[in-house]
């Protein structure tokens, strides 16, 4: 009887020791993520997931790599990063070039791309773009503008085969103050970033005519999460004893949790983002204050996350109909010569992360 009591006591002590904090601390799996741009509220869900410990709760030690000269496609494809964020145009064109990148979650389910003109220019519809100068971004970021122009039968100076284009495209490095409104009649602007910068330059919203490409059927999807075929097929990710597929699902699950929190706690999300970005968080002119600009940005990206009649309640889900539309748009532009292979998108990671069956 005494022996039984002693055994029970020892067992209880051992159990308490095993349950004590740090007694058997889980070894976190290192994961590197390359974001598409500098830290800002555009990526709030990631930073909130980090700050709230959502990644650690999944057993992940997530490191965000600083934005450099290389694109996320390059850093992920070469193995410098394990996962990344990019736009669907970048992912599909890379896949078409034989780079084995794979879409695993769609964060922004509506495009935030716009073309902005002054109301005083009397540009009221896309047909009025003819004979105008349009400011566009380089490196594939011009595709939404080109797609909109093509839809309305307008050619651009970006097409070297056209001798007398309808629209003069002016490529510039993202800052609208460089070209607008003196050097271009319309300028590219994301709802969550450059529009606020333009307002800061002294052009209030009531003075602007904003053409949102999604409103004209050009809903080329933006921020998504991706990895490579190689990572998803890895049986033992970095010696963790877990497959790449399992790690991907954990990363997506924690990231979506971070996004869900950020969207519903926007002020707190902004407070988490601000210390991470410094000058890169600032706007322009009267909107230069980082907190003001990031508050605007957080409110606007929240409108892009988990939106649409078929995706509401399905955060991170890629609507197949929207995807097919995006492929058709890129093929129509001649950017894709053929439809992507089936491996360009996987729903298995999203299903494992959410415990839901992806509607098809």
Task: Annotate each predicted stretch with a short phrase.
Residues 89-90, 172-282:
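Pocket-lining segment of extracytoplasmic ligand-binding domains
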Residues 26-181, 185-192, 211-213, 218-219:
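Short, glycine-/small- and polar/acidic-enriched structural segments
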Residues 236-335:
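Secondary-structure end/capping motifs
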Residues 1-10:
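Bacterial N-terminal signal peptides that target proteins for export
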Residues 9-18:
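Bacterial N-terminal signal peptides
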Residues 19-25:
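Sec/Tat signal peptide C-region and signal peptidase I cleavage site
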Residues 320-360:
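Conserved C-terminal helix/tail region of periplasmic/extracytoplasmic solute-binding proteins
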């Amino acid at each position: 009887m005494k022996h039984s009591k002693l055994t029970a006591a020892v067992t209880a002590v051992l159990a308490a020791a095993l349950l004590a904090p740090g007694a058997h601390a889980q070894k976190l799996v290192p994961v590197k993520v390359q974001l598409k741009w500098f830290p800002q509220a555009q990526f709030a869900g990631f930073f909130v997931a980090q700050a709230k410990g959502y990644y650690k709760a999944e057993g992940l030690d997530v490191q965000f790599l600083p934005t450099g000269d290389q694109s996320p496609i390059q850093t992920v494809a070469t193995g410098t990063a394990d996962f990344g964020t990019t736009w669907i145009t970048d992912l599909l064109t890379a896949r078409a070039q034989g780079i084995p990148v794979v879409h695993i979650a769609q964060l922004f389910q509506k495009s935030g791309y716009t073309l902005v003109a002054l109301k005083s220019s009397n540009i009221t519809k896309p047909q009025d773009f003819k004979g105008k100068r349009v400011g566009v971004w380089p490196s594939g970021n011009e595709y939404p503008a080109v797609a909109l122009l093509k839809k309305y039968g307008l050619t651009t100076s970006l097409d070297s085969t056209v001798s007398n284009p309808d629209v003069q495209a002016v490529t510039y490095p993202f800052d609208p103050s460089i070209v607008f409104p003196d050097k271009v009649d319309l300028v590219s602007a994301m709802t969550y970033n450059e529009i606020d910068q333009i307002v800061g330059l002294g052009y209030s919203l009531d003075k602007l005519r904003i053409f949102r490409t999604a409103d004209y059927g050009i809903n080329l999807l933006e921020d998504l999460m991706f990895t490579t075929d190689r990572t998803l097929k890895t049986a033992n990710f970095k010696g963790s004893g877990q497959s790449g597929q399992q790690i991907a699902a954990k990363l997506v699950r924690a990231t979506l949790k971070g996004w869900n929190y950020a969207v519903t706690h926007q002020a707190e999300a902004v407070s988490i983002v601000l210390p991470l970005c410094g000058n890169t968080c600032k706007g322009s002119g009267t909107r230069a204050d980082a907190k003001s600009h990031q508050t605007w940005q957080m409110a606007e990206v929240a409108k892009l996350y988990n939106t649409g009649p078929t995706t509401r309640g399905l955060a991170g889900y890629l609507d197949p109909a929207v995807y097919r539309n995006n492929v058709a748009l890129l093929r129509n532009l001649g950017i894709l010569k053929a439809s992507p292979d089936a491996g360009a998108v996987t729903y298995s990671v999203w299903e494992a992360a959410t415990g839901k069956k992806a509607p098809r």
